[in-house]
């Protein structure tokens, strides 16, 4: 038995399921999860001392690679002056100014401690600003575990939302409408059936929680137009895509200006940070200037702000955005070529520094229904084969994978060599 397996058994005695976030339990792929002891650059090292090329990156934040020296020193320096004050600091101003510089639609910004806090607060703000109760999300998109967002579609486009988790009251879920990602017709249909009642649309501009699904041409432009026509706010949930799809986020990549944006992951440089922001007239509704209440003991934590500030300043250095996208494209295209070489049907999607692949005969994968038709069992087999060859992919067929600036030619070449061998095994097993 490996040390990771021993630790997993021990963890289950005091931690529900042995993990502090469900996907870490490897339920999506089977087997025991890796317990990580340390990480550096593009590598993680498990409790048994084995190294893996990492394409999870702590689920997105480690865009510069693990344990970056500059971020580490920024954290140490900040910690030496105090861990938390519960009072404003100058670094909060600097951080807000930097985020606004990189994401100009965020004219004012409120820091929080997680992506879930950011989306939950943005939804409350949209409701308060518009005076409307209903919100619209998309099937297959995830926006954190707030009650109003743990909702799935009913049986038909015009039915009320249904809770996707016990503990979410049906009376609460009924205010959440679910449309089909990349389908403007479903959006218009819901607005027509709920005239003057919808406060906002919240969307992952690149859906990263049903693997990696980019928008089809005109989709985001259509959302912007519909929101303007209907008096609803457009919220881009850039917790995953922010600073990763492009330095200015997916909104810069697709040239769309949302009313509100939520951020997480990369913004903290590895520390727990989230943020929401947008048009000044909307943000002025947030307490203490406005009536929409939001607060947090650790919001704007000085150590976390120092880490995020260091991360974003490094990230904005010239050439980094293009380098990240180029190496991710090289990896994604390499997967596709090798799959074709071995006769493995596969769709590969990639935007900026995120990518995903689907074992499927379909020509494209553009929505949740397409994702559900993919071969999850083959993904599970491929995941474990790659893990055996020292490559750590996202342990779920429904999660995106990520590269970092620390992934060099050596790591990408080694990953593709491993993929070549693993695809060969899959092809042989299919005979």
UniProtKB/Swiss-Prot annotation:
It is an enzyme of class 5 (isomerase). The keyword Cytoplasm applies. It is found in: Cytoplasm. Pathway: Porphyrin-containing compound metabolism; protoporphyrin-IX biosynthesis; 5-aminolevulinate from L-glutamyl-tRNA(Glu): step 2/2. Its main location: cytoplasm. SUPFAM superfamilies: PLP-dependent transferases. GO terms for molecular function: glutamate-1-semialdehyde 2,1-aminomutase activity; pyridoxal phosphate binding; transaminase activity. PANTHER family: GLUTAMATE-1-SEMIALDEHYDE 2,1-AMINOMUTASE, GLUTAMATE-1-SEMIALDEHYDE 2,1-AMINOMUTASE 1, CHLOROPLASTIC-RELATED. Homodimer. Belongs to the class-III pyridoxal-phosphate-dependent aminotransferase family. HemL subfamily. This is Glutamate-1-semialdehyde 2,1-aminomutase. It comes from Vibrio campbellii (strain ATCC BAA-1116). The lineage of its organism: Bacteria, Pseudomonadati, Pseudomonadota, Gammaproteobacteria, Vibrionales.
């Amino acid at each position: 038995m490996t040390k990771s397996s021993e630790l997993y058994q021990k963890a289950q005695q005091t931690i529900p399921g042995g993990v502090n976030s469900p996907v870490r339990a490897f339920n999506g792929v089977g087997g025991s999860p890796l317990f990580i002891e340390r990480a550096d650059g593009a590598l993680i090292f498990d409790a048994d001392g084995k190294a893996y090329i990492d394409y999870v990156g702590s689920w997105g934040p480690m865009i510069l690679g693990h344990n970056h020296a500059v971020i580490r020193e920024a954290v140490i320096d900040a910690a030496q002056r105090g861990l938390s004050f519960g009072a404003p600091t100058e670094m909060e101003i600097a951080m807000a100014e930097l985020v606004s510089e990189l994401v100009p639609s965020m004219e004012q910004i409120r820091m929080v401690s997680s992506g879930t806090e950011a989306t939950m607060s943005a939804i409350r703000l949209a409701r308060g600003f518009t005076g409307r109760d209903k919100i619209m999300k998309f099937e297959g998109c995830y926006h954190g575990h707030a009650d109003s967002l743990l909702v799935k579609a009913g049986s038909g486009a015009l039915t009320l939302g249904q809770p996707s988790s016990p503990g979410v009251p049906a009376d609460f879920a009924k205010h959440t409408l679910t449309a089909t990602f990349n389908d403007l017709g479903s959006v218009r249909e819901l607005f027509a059936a709920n005239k003057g009642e919808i406060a906002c649309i919240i969307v992952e501009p690149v859906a990263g929680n049903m693997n990696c699904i980019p928008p089809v041409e005109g989709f985001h432009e259509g959302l912007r137009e519909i929101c303007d026509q209907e008096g609803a706010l457009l919220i881009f949930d850039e917790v995953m895509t922010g600073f990763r799809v492009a330095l200015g986020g997916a909104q810069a990549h697709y040239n769309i200006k949302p009313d509100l944006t939520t951020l997480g992951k990369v913004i903290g440089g590895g520390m727990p940070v989230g943020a929401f922001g947008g048009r000044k007239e909307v943000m002025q509704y947030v307490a203490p200037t406005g009536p929409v209440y939001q607060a947090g003991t650790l919001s704007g934590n000085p150590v976390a702000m120092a880490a995020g500030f260091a991360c974003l300043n490094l990230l904005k250095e010239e050439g980094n955005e293009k380098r990240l996208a180029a190496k991710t494209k090289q990896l994604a295209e390499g997967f596709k070529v090798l799959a074709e070489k071995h006769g493995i049907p596969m769709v590969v999607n990639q935007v900026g520094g995120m990518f995903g692949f689907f074992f499927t005969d379909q020509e494209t994968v553009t929505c949740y229904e397409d994702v559900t038709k993919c071969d999850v069992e083959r993904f599970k087999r491929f995941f474990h084969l790659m893990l055996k060859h020292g490559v750590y992919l996202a342990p779920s067929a429904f999660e995106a994978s990520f590269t970092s600036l620390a992934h060099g030619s050596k790591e990408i070449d080694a990953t593709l060599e491993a993929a070549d061998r693993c695809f060969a095994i899959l092809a042989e097993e299919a005979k």
